[in-house]
């Protein structure tokens, strides 16, 4: 087992240094354990000072479960959401209490997935129903801008050299290691406040030599002394020791930003006019060398630039000032960021307005001055806001004052009345349309009935014509074998169909026929009688 794990603190009270920070964390954890939700914690400080250890000890002492994720390793939106986003909204299945979510190195979210990763972290913080502890190495990182307002920030300081030295002595005593006190103190000092690094270095020395001396320190490399940029500026302005300043200038940052930061804070620290003049002369020489480096692409000029802005500015003062001076960021960057915000806002507004006005955003940008006049009237401003669908921040581009709530209320009531009238008109129109449809249906039905009756009359007339025609044809064609009864029936049917002029003829004809038939019948009877008599 490595010594870092072997001699790691077993409870929160065992952690070295940062007593105030530990007390704040304990208060936060107590409130969560009592069921009072708190803002997520954001622990900020250099590596190796116990942030992660404290987070895990809090999880062990106060919560039922701990889930950890390194945000800099899992940078995309989907990965962060799936790994910790879902866990933040659900309670533990197997334990009753809250589960602690630990997100390490949130300031390390970078690369192409940056926007997605940062968005996932922000959404997790916003929607979480579980306690969250976030950790960052650089408290001044721009990547924490959106996270800081949502969290309770706690700053951690480096562990004091004496505290590290005492811990190393305890480890040596337990491991039965002989040591030179001066060598051990040098090791503690060179760890630069990083307790973890000091313990790891001690273990590396012991693996090579069972005794710690000044010579044994050569086994390990001096801890990379990359400074925080604000510590660098403090060293340049406060110190007169060239070696100390040179050590402080070992900072991983862009020279143009560093030169601006030093130049901004010179008049805040230096009080004598001649000191300020000399310091700015050094800044000017540094700037000349930076310009040469960028112009010729020969970056060896950078070392001269660092020499002038570091040792040169430090040497400009006759004595150090024992006062507190707050280091501020260059005003030029503040102004640029403000103007960038304004530019972005202007771009958003012109994009929205161009869609409605059917003109290019660039052309519209020239006309924004005239809209400022239109936005002076409250009611007109409200109408324009609604028409272009502008937010309150976007309205500020045209007017400093917010549109009064009374105007909004008045316009809303007016709009509601207009909507009601419009609805009534729509209902009326619907009724009119329905009546029109009914009338159309009625006229259509009437037309259909007319057409049908006309068709029926035509069919009836055609039928009667066909029957009369068939009767005429039957009369003209003679029948060969027709009985007298048939003839009589035919004659009767003929009598019915014939006109009144022929009715007298037919009646006389029938009477003659009747007489003939009666005579024949009499003859038959007489024959029959004669036969019987015979």
Curated annotation (Swiss-Prot):
GO MF, any single term: DNA clamp loader activity
Binding site for ATP: 45-52
Keywords: ATP-binding, DNA replication, Nucleotide-binding
Compositional bias of kind Basic and acidic residues: 444-463
KW Nucleotide-binding (keyword) present: yes
Comp. bias regions, Low complexity: 488-510
Segments of skewed composition (Basic residues): 517-527
Example GO BP: DNA replication
Segments forming a coiled coil: none
Chain intervals for the UniProt region annotation (Disordered): 444-534
Source domain of life: Archaea
Subunit structure as annotated in this protein's UniProt entry: Heteromultimer composed of small subunits (RfcS) and large subunits (RfcL).
Role played: Part of the RFC clamp loader complex which loads the PCNA sliding clamp onto DNA.
Family indicated by similarity: Belongs to the activator 1 small subunits family. RfcL subfamily.
HAMAP family the record matches: RfcL (MF_01508)
Identification of the protein by name: Replication factor C large subunit
Gene source species: Methanosphaera stadtmanae (strain ATCC 43021 / DSM 3091 / JCM 11832 / MCB-3)
Lineage, opening ranks: Archaea, Methanobacteriati, Methanobacteriota, Methanomada group, Methanobacteria
């Amino acid at each position: 087992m490595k010594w870092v794990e072997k001699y790691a603190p077993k409870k929160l009270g065992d952690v070295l240094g940062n007593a105030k920070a530990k007390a704040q964390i304990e208060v936060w954890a107590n409130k969560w354990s009592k069921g009072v939700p708190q803002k997520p914690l954001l622990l900020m400080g250099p590596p190796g000072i116990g942030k992660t250890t404290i987070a895990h000890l809090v999880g062990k002492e106060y919560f039922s479960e701990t889930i950890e994720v390194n945000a800099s390793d899992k940078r995309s939106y989907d990965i962060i959401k799936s790994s910790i986003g879902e866990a933040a909204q659900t309670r533990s299945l197997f334990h009753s209490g809250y589960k602690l979510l630990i997100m390490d190195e949130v300031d390390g979210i970078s690369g192409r997935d940056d926007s997605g990763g940062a968005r996932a972290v922000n959404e997790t913080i916003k929607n979480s129903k579980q306690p969250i502890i976030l950790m960052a190495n650089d408290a001044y990182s721009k990547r924490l801008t959106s996270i800081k307002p949502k969290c309770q920030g706690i700053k951690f300081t480096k562990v004091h050299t004496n505290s590290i030295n005492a811990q190393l002595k305890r480890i040596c005593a337990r491991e039965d290691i002989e040591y030179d006190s001066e060598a051990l103190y040098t090791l503690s000092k060179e760890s630069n406040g990083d307790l973890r690094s000091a313990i790891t270095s001690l273990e590396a020395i012991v693996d090579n030599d069972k005794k710690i001396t000044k010579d044994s320190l050569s086994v390990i490399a001096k801890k990379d002394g990359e400074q925080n940029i604000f510590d660098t500026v403090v060293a340049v302005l406060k110190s007169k020791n060239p070696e100390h300043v040179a050590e402080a200038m070992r900072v991983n940052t862009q020279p143009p930003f560093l030169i601006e930061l030093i130049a901004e804070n010179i008049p805040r620290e230096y009080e004598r006019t001649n000191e300020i003049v000399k310091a700015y002369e050094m800044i000017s020489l540094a700037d000349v060398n930076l310009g040469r480096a960028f112009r010729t692409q020969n970056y060896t000029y950078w070392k001269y630039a660092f020499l002038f802005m570091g040792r040169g500015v430090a040497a400009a003062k006759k004595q150090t000032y024992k006062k507190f001076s707050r280091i501020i960021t260059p005003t030029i960057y503040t102004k640029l960021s403000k103007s960038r915000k304004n530019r972005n806002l202007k771009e958003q507004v012109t994009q929205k307005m161009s869609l409605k006005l059917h003109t290019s955003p660039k052309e519209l940008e020239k006309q924004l001055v005239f809209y400022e006049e239109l936005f002076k009237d409250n009611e007109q401003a409200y109408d324009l806001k609604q028409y272009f669908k502008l937010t309150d921040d976007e309205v500020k581009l045209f007017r400093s004052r917010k549109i009064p709530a009374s105007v909004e209320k008045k316009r809303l009531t007016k709009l509601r009345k207009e909507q009601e009238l419009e609805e009534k008109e729509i209902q009326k129109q619907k009724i009119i349309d329905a009546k029109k449809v009914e009338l159309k249906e009625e006229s259509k039905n009437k037309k259909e009935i007319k057409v049908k009756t006309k068709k029926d009359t035509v069919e009836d007339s055609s039928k009667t014509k066909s029957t009369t025609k068939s009767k005429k044809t039957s009369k003209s064609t003679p029948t060969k074998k027709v009985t007298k009864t048939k003839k009589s029936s035919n004659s009767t049917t003929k009598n019915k169909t014939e006109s009144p002029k022929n009715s007298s003829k037919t009646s006389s004809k029938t009477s003659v026929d009747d007489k003939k038939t009666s005579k024949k019948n009499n003859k038959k009877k007489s024959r029959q009688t004669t036969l019987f008599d015979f």
